[in-house]
């Protein structure tokens, strides 16, 4: 068995209709996966966080694996294979009330070849159903009888999971988390090595040489940060036809987990669909974001090259106006000090406190310069207040929330940004009816 990789990921795998999604929903304490008595309902991997006995880890739900050459079944198999590759513990769910099938044996073979730690969960053994003892011939060490519907046996499984994991460096989990994201071979690992000043990732011309998500800590201006270098996919594997799609899904998972995302674009290439999607996802999710243009040393430069590049990028994606753009060469460690300063700037902006009298002045100026009237009704913003949420959030107490158009909210956001530095931070505006 391979040593555990300290990525705190647990995958739920199995054939269709054995109760994987029911188990997943019970573990996370809410309905996330669709539960339906039909094979193939869960098509994509779904990630959620779990806390058990004070320990945090992530769990992945996957679609059912069967022996078939149907296209959608193959996509599910690929999804599950990726989940197996990136996880350190596998929960192999089978229907304990039925005989072992060829699909169960096929999955067992995949799991044995993965060399990962596997816990076999014989589900649906409630209501005094008879157990099929052939499950013990699957070739694994740990077997548990559970009922995902009623929760029986789940606690024992979770106890085993946290006992298998390495939580020695759990204090790092409380640090400010930065995810390094980007298309394979954009320079994610080179940037990680430059920031940590040590070789943590293999740097190669071959895309996808980072096989596991690598987590490191760095210090900038005496502040400690937790860095996640998103895993790639081996280009030589059978998953090659779907590399970009699944790399994107992994990037989205890392972005969800992070406090700040650094999205790397290769300066020598055109803006890819991959980068456009992940930047758009960061914007939609309102995630603090820095865009890094890497390999800038390879670009033939003129006086305004950097300015022109940034201008064109912002024209292509107008929604990134609040995201800073930093030009670097990770391999040659050029302009990394600039990137480090921007990281500190964004972190400070996220926790920026604003005195109420300054917000009151802003409120007066906004309504004086650009009052809003809609169908004869005048908008009156009575009060503005900043909350303590992780992302800068402002409550606007108004006389009539229904007449506020999104364009006026954009005007308010722009005014806030003109008054205060929120570089790299999304801004939430919440309308409240003034009482």
Swiss-Prot record:
So where does GTP 1 get bound? 14-21, 61-65, 123-126
The UniProt keyword set, sorted, is:
GTP-binding, Nucleotide-binding, Repeat, Ribosome biogenesis
Listed binding positions for GTP 2 are 182-189, 229-233, 294-297
Q: Does the keyword Cell membrane apply?
A: no
Q: Which CDD domains match?
A: EngA1, EngA2
Show where the EngA-type G domain sits.
8-169, 176-351
One Pfam match, given by its short name, reads: MMR_HSR1
Q: Which terms under GO biological process does the entry name?
A: ribosome biogenesis
Task: Outline what the protein does.
Answer: GTPase that plays an essential role in the late steps of ribosome biogenesis.
**UniProt subunit comment:** Associates with the 50S ribosomal subunit.
Q: Which family does it belong to?
A: Belongs to the TRAFAC class TrmE-Era-EngA-EngB-Septin-like GTPase superfamily. EngA (Der) GTPase family.
Name of this chain's protein: GTPase Der
Originating species: Mycoplasmopsis pulmonis (strain UAB CTIP) (Mycoplasma pulmonis)
The root-end lineage is:
Bacteria, Bacillati, Mycoplasmatota, Mycoplasmoidales, Metamycoplasmataceae
């Amino acid at each position: 068995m391979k040593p555990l990789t300290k990525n705190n990921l647990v995958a739920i795998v199995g054939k269709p209709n054995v109760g994987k999604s029911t188990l997943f929903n019970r573990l996370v304490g809410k309905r996330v996966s669709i539960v339906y008595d039909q094979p193939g309902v869960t098509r994509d991997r779904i990630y959620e966080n779990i806390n058990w006995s004070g320990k945090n880890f992530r769990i992945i739900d996957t679609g059912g694996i069967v022996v078939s050459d149907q296209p959608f079944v193959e996509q599910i198999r690929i999804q599950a294979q990726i989940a197996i590759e990136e996880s350190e513990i596998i929960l192999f769910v089978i229907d304990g009330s039925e005989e072992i099938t060829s699909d169960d044996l096929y999955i067992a073979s995949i799991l044995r070849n993965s060399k990962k730690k596997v816990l076999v969960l014989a589900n649906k053994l409630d209501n005094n159903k008879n157990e099929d003892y052939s499950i013990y011939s699957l070739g694994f060490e740990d077997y548990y009888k559970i009922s995902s519907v009623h929760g029986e046996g789940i606690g024992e499984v979770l106890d085993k999971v946290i006992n298998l994991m390495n939580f020695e460096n759990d204090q790092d989990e409380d640090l400010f988390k930065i995810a390094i994201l980007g298309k394979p071979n954009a320079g994610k690992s080179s940037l990680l090595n430059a920031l940590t000043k040590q070789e943590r990732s293999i740097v190669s011309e071959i895309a996808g040489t980072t096989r596991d998500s690598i987590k490191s800590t760095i210090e900038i201006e005496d502040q400690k940060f937790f860095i996640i270098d998103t895993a790639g996919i081996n280009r030589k594997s059978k998953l090659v036809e779907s590399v970009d799609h699944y790399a994107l899904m992994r990037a989205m998972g890392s972005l969800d987990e992070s406090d700040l995302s650094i999205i790397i674009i290769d300066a020598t290439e055109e803006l890819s669909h991959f980068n456009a999607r992940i930047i758009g996802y960061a914007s939609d999710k309102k995630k603090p974001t820095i865009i890094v243009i890497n390999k800038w040393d390879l670009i033939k430069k003129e006086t305004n090259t950097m300015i022109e590049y940034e201008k064109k990028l912002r024209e292509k994606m107008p929604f990134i106006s609040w995201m800073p753009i930093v030009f670097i060469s990770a391999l040659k460690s050029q302009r990394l000090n600039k990137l480090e300063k921007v990281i500190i700037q964004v972190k400070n902006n996220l926790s920026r406190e604003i005195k109420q009298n300054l917000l009151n002045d802003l409120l007066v100026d906004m309504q004086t310069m650009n009052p809003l009237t809609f169908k004869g009704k005048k908008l009156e913003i009575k009060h503005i207040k900043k909350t303590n949420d992780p992302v800068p959030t402002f409550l606007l107490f108004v006389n009539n929330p229904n007449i506020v158009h999104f364009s006026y909210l954009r005007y308010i956001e722009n005014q806030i940004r003109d008054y205060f530095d929120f570089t790299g931070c999304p801004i939430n505006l919440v309308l409240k009816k003034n009482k």
